Design a protein with these regions (language model features):
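Catalytic core of DAGKc-family lipid kinases
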Residues: 80-202
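Glycine-rich phosphate/pyrophosphate-binding beta-alpha loops
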Residues: 150, 154, 205-219
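Short glycine/serine/threonine-rich phosphate/pyrophosphate-binding segments
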Residues: 47, 70-74, 101, 127
Length: 304
């Protein structure tokens, strides 16, 4: 039986502004004769449980109303559920987050009406899904990322970002300017299929999509559907290097710096030389430990 679409909305997305759009979204979905059931998250991470329950109820199509964090958790829920092949589940997006990085990467309109029209048209594409296995002292965790995951400065900033959230899309910029003086490079061993190196890292991450962190372009020319991770490594940065390159993170010209390396691999391992290595993904702290990254090729079926 066709259950239609399960619409999952995060009312706290964009500092609560998404909640005000609910009635408009429902009206537009009805006007397009899109059959749907409505689910609202009440706490962080509830998207995963909602997806698991909805799949058990027969839903095979989901609409995410929110930002990158909401999308990431819905897709994680699709992977975790045991009822059907995750590739057979379709996800559409009405992007109402602060950054909407994934929506930009897959060229989903940021306008609500146009995004809903895309869902109505029903055209789909396949996209890669990133995975990181975090081997900590007491447990091993597996987390999924739709855009970018890494270590270094951006993970350092995420721990301090909460008090800047009220600034919306400028939160990361303000947090970075206020706190970059306190960051110290971390020496990391990094291994891929055809490379092995040890560097003092300012920023090191892997991605399957172009944008992250509210528009930063840290990943160079990701295909997003070839089963490969694109790694970017900024090493031996001084405070002057950070200042010089800060805005280059947003326009893509950071790759012109000789201290920035890029490489492609299907599997990448990162191990700290000393201490603990904190990993983040899609704007969320995932955990600390030794890291192994890989890709589930064309694992996501999304509206385009």
């Amino acid at each position: 039986m066709n259950k239609g679409w399960a619409v999952i909305i995060n009312p706290q997305s964009r500092a609560g502004a998404t909640k005000k759009k609910t009635s408009i979204i429902k009206r537009l979905l009805n006007s397009e004769k899109i059959h749907f059931s409505y689910y609202k998250t009440r706490r962080a991470g509830e998207e995963i449980n909602i997806v698991e329950r909805a799949v058990e109820e027969g839903f095979r199509k989901f609409i995410c109303v929110g930002g990158d964090g909401t999308i990431q958790k819905i897709i994680a829920g699709i992977q975790i559920q045991k009822v059907c092949d995750p590739k057979k589940i379709v996800i559409g997006i009405i992007p109402l987050g602060t950054g909407n990085d994934w929506a930009k990467s897959i060229k989903v309109p940021l306008n609500i009406k146009r995004a809903i029209r895309k869902i109505k048209e029903g055209k789909t594409k396949k996209r890669d899904l990133g995975v990181v296995v975090i081997k900590g002292k007491r447990e091993i965790k597996k987390r999924y990322f739709i855009s970018y995951s890494g270590v270094g400065f951006d993970a350092f900033m995420l721990k301090r970002l909460q008090k800047y959230k009220w600034l919306g899309k400028y939160a990361y910029l303000a947090c970075s300017i206020a706190n970059f003086w306190f960051y110290k490079n971390t020496r990391i061993s990094i291994k891929g299929e055809k490379f092995s190196l040890s560097k003092s890292v300012f920023l090191c991450g892997v991605g399957v999509s172009k944008y992250t962190g509210g528009g930063m372009q840290i990943i160079k020319n990701p295909a997003g559907n070839n089963g490969l991770l694109n790694l970017t490594l900024a090493h031996d940065f001084t405070k002057i290097d950070i200042i010089k390159n800060f805005f280059n993170l947003f326009n893509g010209s950071i790759f012109n710096d000789p201290k920035v390396l890029t490489v492609v691999s299907s599997k990448i391992k990162m191990v700290p030389k000393t201490g603990s290595l904190t990993c983040h993904g899609d704007g969320e702290i995932f955990g600390s430990g030794n890291l192994t990254f890989f890709v589930l090729k064309k694992q996501i079926t999304h509206i385009c």
